Amino acid sequence: MAKLFISQPMRGLTDEEILKAREEIRIRAEKTIGEPVEVIDSYFTDYPGEVCKSVPIWYLGKSIQLLSQADVVYFGGDWRNARGCRIEYQVASDYGLVILEE
């Protein structure tokens, strides 16, 4: 079973919208690669309360850590216009991960 990392824009979306999109992406990824996938949980609902200068960078760092576990990375939605998604794409591409995109 392949491990799937989902990269998607989240700004301005509700939890329900994000989770619905993630499920749709999981289904598309399974159809594309022809096998079940295990989704790496990269949707964070908490923030540890640490003092930092940039919360988005903190989240991006956590995402890149999880990206290291992926066999396949799926870029969904309008990812090209999301700064964090573009950085995740660059990392996945530079390190030779299998990339699927909408």
Summary of predicted features, one role per range:
Residues 1-102:
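Conserved catalytic or regulatory cores that recognize and/or transform ribose-phosphate-containing ligands
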